[in-house]
From Swiss-Prot:
Residues bearing PTM Phosphothreonine: T55
Protein's gene: zuo1
Modification type Phosphoserine: residues: S57, S76
PANTHER family: DNAJ HOMOLOG SUBFAMILY C MEMBER 2
UniProt KW Aminoacyl-tRNA synthetase keyword: no
Protein name from the UniProt record: Zuotin
Pfam families recorded: DnaJ, RAC_head, ZUO1-like_ZHD
Amino acid sequence: MSAGDSIQLFPPTTKQAIEASFVPHGKISPLIKRAVEPVGPLFLAHARRQRHGRTFSEDERLEVKNKVQEEVKEESEDEEEDPAMLRADPKEWKQQDHYAVLGLSKYRYKADTEQIKKAHLKKVLKHHPDKKAASGNINDDSFFKCIQKAYEILSDPVRRRQFDSVDENADVEPPESTTKETFFELWTPVFESEARFSKKQPVPSLGTIESTRAEVDNFYNFWYNFDSWRSFEYLDKDIPDDGESRDNKRFQEKKNRSERQKNKARDNARLRNLVDTALASDPRIKLFKEQEKAAKAARKWEREAGAREAAAAAQKKKEEEERRAAEEAAAKASAAAANKKAKEDKKKAQKRDKKVVKNALKDFNYFSATDVPSAEHVDSVLKDVDVIMSKLGEGELGQLAADINAEKAAGAASVQAVFDKFAKMFIERGSMSSADVVFFAQ
């Protein structure tokens, strides 16, 4: 920008414009006069130090002591002290239950640093040698040494973990047997106790009967691949630090390492056996197997659906073919029976009709003009009848018999005329000649 250039600015807002655009939304409440005093725990602590003429560290130490003493007075459920524990030899400190010494048996590995400090202070206040000296027990400081040793162990994270590794009083033994209803109630505390040794946190819970297959698999996979920080240095045999024999020292260190490895292997085997036992009695595993079996059967059923449909179709086709074959066989049998009956009926009818013809010849004396026909006459009539009978077509024998029956009442001439009619019919038809007959149609 050159010196000759200029910038145009907006005119400033006037007071009138500001007042015109102002919109009040409320009023400020009236002022009230109140008394203000310094309060709070920090002010009270400052006032207390000023009043008693204490330094900061002196005041803090006395307040902690007073607080512990108040807690000691208020707590009515302090652990009872075993008389045998009170007589314990401080030299045998590895044999003592450090949590019991400090009155933390019900907390054990769950006790936090603050609880350990408070418990130690309470025990010190109760069993300090100066306090016992006032009671006449001048040299009775054995249990106080046990208290100091317990606090020394439990206040050191490394040494406390070593003690927790072998603290059998914190273990929960697995149940000998369970039912579907008691499995979770009895096994959950067992796994919660074992979970304290896990490097991986949080540890998956045992769950419930409603847990999914994935959750159950994850739980047992975790325990079968359990990564434990548990060690067994606490059980090491003490190595004398007398400098007399380095070989003995190295030997004892080697022996301690070997024992730690053996204890670790035994503990791993114990834990695996524990998990095996839980898995074998877990009601969910049986349930999952039943569900898997049902799902497998369902998949097989679906997979074989085509084969079943084909088999059903083949069976249906077979049944249809068998039905048709049975119907055809029945129809054939029925037709055969009907045909047989028809043949038998026809045969009977022919036999009956032939009998009518034969009886007609006898009844009308072979159409002889004399009372006793000659043999030649009878023979010629019979031959003519045989010729006529041989030329009869389908149904014509019945017609012949019917015509004879119809004319029998009229007499011999009428019956003879029936034979004549049939003979002439056959001659006209060409099935025979006039020479083929001697008596009829002449």
